[in-house]
Design a protein with these regions (language model features):
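Glycan-processing catalytic domains of CAZymes
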Residues: 1-204
Length: 204
């Protein structure tokens, strides 16, 4: 939360070869949590370091496990909220010039896509809202909690991201790897012609 520390973190990351941060994003039917670091970073323009968001779309629980016990804030889904959510991101976050993109498309990751009642429809809604603003999206799903493979991508994601230690292997269009894979060709990031080439580090 301290601006000076964020600057130091970015400098340290750049020094050791990282070229972007992935911030966890908490959205509960319009209610945001732990948003201060991202909001301050957006307002100040500092650090001048690439970033993206990953939506931690699970229940907010006392045990921090995303489960069904001791739920403090429940994660609920609706088409109305899908539209409100992506509009907020398009208007307030994705426009930032530091935001990580692939082929000009802002990259947005979903932590647990298997929890959505209709992930395919949510993706359709997100892309509709982006198109209405003359934009496109590059959507990724995190392979975790035994939800991994080609069938998970088939609902409309562009790529998959491993989340160790929950996924020992990624499976994308018949390809297997131990690193991030590309949905366009199934190759690892090192072999794909148009991969997500920006290494990222997750931060809350």
């Amino acid at each position: 939360r301290v601006p000076g520390v964020r600057q130091q973190q970015a400098a340290l990351a750049e020094r050791y070869g990282l070229s972007g941060f992935c911030y966890y994003h908490y959205w509960f039917n319009g209610h945001r949590l732990m948003q201060r670091p991202v909001e301050e970073m957006l307002a100040s323009g500092k650090p001048d370091f690439p970033f993206m968001l990953c939506w931690a779309n699970e229940n907010w629980t006392r045990a921090w496990d995303g489960g069904e016990q001791e739920v403090l804030i429940r994660q609920e889904y609706s088409e109305e909220d899908d539209r409100a959510h992506i509009r907020y991101l398009l208007d307030e976050v994705f426009r930032d010039p530091r935001y990580i993109r692939v082929d000009g498309k802002p990259v947005f990751a979903v932590y647990r896509s298997a929890l959505f009642p209709d992930m395919r429809r949510t993706i359709e809604v997100w892309r509709e809202e982006a198109a209405a603003r003359g934009a496109e999206l590059y959507l990724c799903r995190v392979e975790s909690f035994n939800a991994a493979g080609r069938e998970e991508l088939a609902v409309g994601f562009d790529a998959a991201i491993e989340f160790q230690p929950f996924t020992p292997v990624s499976i994308v269009r018949g390809g297997r790897s131990s690193c991030t894979t590309c949905a366009n060709c199934g190759a690892t990031a090192a072999r794909c012609a148009k991969p997500i080439t920006t290494p990222t580090s997750h931060t809350a």
